[in-house]
Every structure is written in structure tokens, then in C-alpha cells.
Amino acid sequence: MVGLGRALTLESAAPDAIAQVRRAWEATPASSPAPTSDAARPGEATPASSPVPYTGAARPGEATPASFPAGDAPSPVLFASFAFRSPARSVAFVPALTLIDEAGARWAITAGIGQAPDPLAAVDAALAEARTAPRVPDSLTFGQGSMSRTQWRDSVQAMAARLREGAADKAVMARDMTVRCSRGFDERFLLERLSDLYPSTWRFSVDSLVGASPEMLIAARGGTVSSRVLAGTCKPGEGQALASSAKDLREHELASESVSSILERLCLDVRAQGPFLLALPNVTHLATDIHARLGAAHLLDLVAALHPTAAVCGTPRDAAMRLIEELEDTERGRYSGPVGWVDTAGDGEFAIALRCGLASGTRLRLFAGAGIMPDSDPDLELTETEAKMRPLLDALGV
């Protein structure tokens, strides 16, 4: 799924940003008349949106959806990237053009440009611009993040000590580093490389936040929901030791329970499968998949209730957040927040924004975090964050 341009933009730095976006999205019917500007505040209408069977990009032998019944057409989509915590900015938007390729069918959903005399010509024009070759970064330079390696290790040591005193059961410490390129970073290049190198992850690029997340916060389709919880990490090839590590198994149990307990309140027939070993090119994780039937809650209600999970914050949530505010001298922004999409039917996917970087001009800010337990080793936790930064570094060819 690819969105080009913006027909409507919603931004919020409020603690209830997810709820605000849900209310605005539900008050924005696809058939509403177009507003006079390309951005709107919560509650304002979105441009009229309509799915259009698109055949112009089909290659010989590929299926096209021209003969699909109208009921099979996808509905308009809202993309969103939410902050880890307020007052960092959350952003959501309806693309001017959304391209969906599913089950051999290609659809173009237009918003705004759907009012053009020739919508398919507008689609072709947008695609022609998007097909320009991605710019390859060169002459990279690397810089320290908000905390030096020594400062971060010291904070981990202090956090583990606080956990041993009973301040919380687990807390997550994040860190960052910077990469600079004189030509700037082309998000399309990064996304293409991540897709090649990490195909089993959920790749995303939303408002300059680009990544390849292995962790699905919540997905909904046709009344069923699923979530993938990750906690407990080791180097590739060390999975058996991870599977028998009391520290990592306890960390994973806390993360899995933080998701299951919320879904049990809001969904039906909750079932957990795991933990199992999830091997990725850069790390191996303990993973649990959770499935349920959707009740009366909307997908964005589940996103708001689940975030932040123990996998990115800690547990108990409020106690862990206090430790993060005290000891983590890194502004996460939208790193480790929910990122994904939702359509007008309430179906969608929201991953946790992990293994990602924020592109801003000539700077790319990379993020990673580690779950800290009372017996955590600061050196091992630092090594874990370095492994988690590999996807973006691999994409850059470093």
C-alpha cells in the first residue's frame, strides 16, 4: 500500500491524540465535499474519495481489477504515526492518491484529484513523479546521539538498581545516533532497501519516519484481530540460550501479559500462541502471537488501549514511564509509537515503530531500545541496541 500526496492532515500533541484522530476519521465520510485547503482540523471533512480500478501500471500477464464487483473495492485509507508520549507530535493523513495491490488486483483510491476531469490521468501523473529513481546516499558521517555510550550504560545501571528496589518490574531504555548525508536522505531508497533486506518485517515510511518493524501492535480484518509481541533478544544463532534464559522469559511474559490482559477486556476469544523463536537477519527474539475476535471496539480504540505496551515502555506502565522520564535522556518522538493505517470499515494494521529512523534534511536519526530488568547487564543491553540499529545501517550499506 502506497500513499502519495495529502488530501487531509491531522496533527496533535495531546495525550489523547489517538482518540482525537479516531473521532476525526469517523466524522470524515468518504463522500464529503472537498474542503478549501489540503489540511483540516479534527472534525473537518475530507475530500471526496473513491476507489478506481487502475490498469495503467499493469505489466503483461498481470491481473487488473476492471471487472471486479463494486463491493470488492477497497475503502479510503488514513495513514497515521503516533508519538510514544505527549507532547511529541502525532500525525495522521489521507493521501491524495492511495495505491493498493492485493490478490492480483490493483486499485487507486483518489481523494481530491478524484474530482479532476480525468482521474486516471491524474493517477498516471502522480505515478510518473513517484517513479523517478531514488537518490542513493553517499559521504555518510556518523554522530553521537542524545546520550553518549557511557552515559547510556550508566543510566541502564541506575535503572536496574531502581528496579531491584521495586520501582517497577521492567522499564525500557531507548537511545539514538545520527547519520548525516550532504545530499539528504531519500526515504524511497531506504524503504526499498529495507524491503529487500528485511522482507519478513512490516516496512513503513510515514511523515519521514522510516523503518522495518518486526512487531505488530494490532491488526484488524473482517472482525478478527491479531498482535505479535516481542521481548527478549539475542544475537543470531543463540536462540536456544534465549529460550532457556529466566531473565528473558520473564521479560517476555510481562510484555505478553500486558497485551493479553487488555485484549481480554476489549475483545472476545483471546488466544495466545508462544513464546517461540523469531529469527531475523540481525537478531533473534522471543515472540508470542495473540489472536481474538473484535467486539464493539474500533481498531483505534485498541491502539489507544494497548500503547505503550510493556515491550516499549515497561510494567507497571505508569511506574515504568516515570523511570523513563527520569533516566532516559532521549526524546523518542514517534519512535516506539504506533504506525500504520485504518480504512473506513475499521480494518487496518498498526505496527510499533521500531528499527527505524527519522529523516530530516541532511540528518537521519536512528533509534533503538532495550528492555531493562533488575538483573540487566548494561554492556549486553548496549550491544542489543546496536544490533537493533542494524536494519537502517544495512539499508545505508554501512
Give short role names for the model-derived ranges.
Residues 1-15, 114-115, 121-157, 179-180, ...:
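Contiguous alpha-helical scaffold segments within structured protein domains
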Residues 1-12, 22, 167-168, 180-193, ...:
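Extreme N-terminus nucleophile/cap motif
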Residues 16-33, 66-178, 246-249, 266-268:
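Non-catalytic accessory segments adjacent to catalytic cores
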Residues 30-34, 39-52, 57-68:
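Long, intrinsically disordered low-complexity tandem-repeat segments
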Residues 78-82, 202-207, 333-340:
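A short glycine-rich, hydrophobically flanked beta-strand micro-motif that places a catalytic Asp/Glu
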Residues 80, 99, 166, 218, ...:
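A residue-level signal for conserved active-site and pocket-lining positions in enzyme catalytic cores
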Residues 89-98, 106, 172-254, 346-369:
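An anion-binding catalytic pocket shared by soluble metabolic enzymes
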Residues 296-398:
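Conserved hydrophobic core element of enzyme catalytic domains
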